[in-house]
């Protein structure tokens, strides 16, 4: 989704779906998708800690690659960053996996 990456979905008896969702900016919390398509956040496990941090700016962009295939990229900048900044360029191979708008317990902390 635009808000992050949903995973571990489980159907509930009332027809709703319980799932976890995270993004580059925050680790997992639990959500409920009701039968009408409304999403409700159920937990905010790290809200207090995240409120102490300056959020990053997350931008998704793309360009035409080999054979005119769409290649996606992401830019993350510290809060308030302006002008030229140092760059960390991470190339991820595939097709077994890809980067997306998700929290990495390996890289984000």
Stretch-by-stretch model annotation:
Residues 1-3:
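Surface loop/turn motifs at the tips and blade-to-blade linkers of beta-strand repeat domains
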């Amino acid at each position: 989704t635009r808000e992050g990456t949903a995973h571990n979905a489980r159907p509930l008896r009332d027809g709703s779906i319980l799932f976890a969702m995270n993004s580059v900016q925050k680790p997992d919390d639990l959500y409920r998708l009701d039968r009408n398509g409304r999403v409700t956040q159920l937990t905010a496990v790290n809200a207090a800690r995240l409120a102490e941090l300056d959020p990053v700016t997350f931008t998704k962009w793309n360009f035409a690659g080999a054979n005119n295939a769409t290649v996606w990229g992401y830019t993350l900048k510290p809060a308030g960053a302006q002008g030229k900044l140092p760059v960390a360029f991470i190339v991820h191979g595939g097709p077994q996996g890809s980067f997306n708008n998700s929290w990495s317990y390996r890289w984000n902390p």
